[in-house]
């Protein structure tokens, strides 16, 4: 079950595998190592890092996370999530880009997606990470457009809703235009676990839109398309707000699972953002095993 009362509370996650990301304007940096510090300037090609998180596992492994802000410093315009792990008490670190889309070209880009504010928690073995994902060109600052109130981004069955790009409004349009598009399409998990498409793209009548494949990371291919649903060139696009994006690692931060999107933001909220740093996993009592992250709401300059 999920609950929101100043915190995000998560249930269990299915066992999943690591992501395979498409290359758009940038190429995902190769995994690498650093000494003494997890995020030295230049790590993975990024000059700037912000919003650190750190947890220690039962076996002593350290797992750290941060925004990779590339050559920028603001809260939007092409941020990605870097995670680094150490098994020798911080002497050496091995990093990977856990959340990465590549539409920023690995530099600050006002029109790109942004992963921001990663937070970590652990039960001692599994590491859980929550982050905010903004669609193309959208963020509270340092992006082309501000996020909008008026919609949660999901339907009543907690399915991600989408609008079809047209000649008048696209996934890269001003968010004032995007918010008024017809969000009559949605994603439904494919009941066939052996199918190529993890999600089915459906219209308002429940008919599957033919010719497209959507994987577990929201990459969409087919009909001449090879992009991600959150990128500016997608043929279908989400509501222009932020989305809470949760993954887990069962191997000490080396690889990360397919994401789960949490439908907890109110339509009246401009953004609901993960309180960065770390969460907790309740270890005793009735709610043993419950995963908890703090969060805050930001609407028109008010932070609650």
Sequence positions of predicted segments:
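Hydrophobic helical h-region of N-terminal Sec-dependent signal peptides
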Residues: 4-8
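Sec-dependent signal peptide cleavage junction
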Residues: 9-25
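Asp-box/BNR beta-propeller blade signature and adjacent active/binding-site loops
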Residues: 22-304
């Amino acid at each position: 079950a999920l609950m929101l009362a100043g915190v995000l509370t998560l249930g269990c996650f299915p066992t999943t595998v690591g992501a395979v990301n498409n290359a758009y304007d940038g190429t995902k940096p190769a995994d690498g190592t650093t000494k003494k510090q997890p995020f030295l300037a230049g790590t993975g090609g990024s000059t700037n890092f912000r919003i650190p998180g750190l947890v220690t596992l039962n076996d002593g492994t350290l797992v750290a996370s941060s925004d990779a802000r590339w050559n920028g410093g603001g809260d939007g315009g092409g941020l990605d999530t870097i995670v680094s792990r150490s098994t020798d008490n911080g002497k050496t670190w091995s990093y990977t880009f856990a959340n990465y889309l590549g539409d920023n070209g690995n530099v600050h880009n006002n029109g790109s997606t942004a992963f921001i504010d990663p937070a970590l928690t652990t039960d001692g073995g599994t590491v859980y990470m929550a982050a905010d994902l903004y669609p193309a060109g959208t963020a509270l600052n340092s992006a082309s457009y501000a996020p909008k109130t008026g919609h949660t981004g999901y339907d009543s069955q907690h399915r991600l809703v989408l609008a079809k790009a047209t000649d008048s409004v696209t996934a890269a349009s001003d968010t004032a235009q995007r918010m008024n598009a017809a969000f009559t399409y949605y994603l439904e998990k494919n009941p066939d676990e052996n199918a190529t498409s993890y999600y089915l793209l459906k219209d308002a009548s429940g008919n599957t839109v033919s010719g497209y494949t959507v994987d577990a990371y929201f990459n969409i291919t087919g009909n001449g398309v090879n992009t991600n649903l959150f990128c500016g060139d997608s043929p279908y696009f989400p509501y222009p707000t932020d989305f809470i994006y949760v993954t887990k690692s069962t191997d000490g931060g080396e690889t990360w699972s397919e994401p789960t999107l949490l439908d907890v933001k109110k339509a009246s909220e401009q953004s609901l953002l993960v309180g960065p740093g770390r969460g907790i996993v309740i270890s005793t009592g009735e709610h043993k095993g419950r995963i908890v992250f703090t969060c805050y709401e930001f609407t028109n300059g008010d932070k609650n």
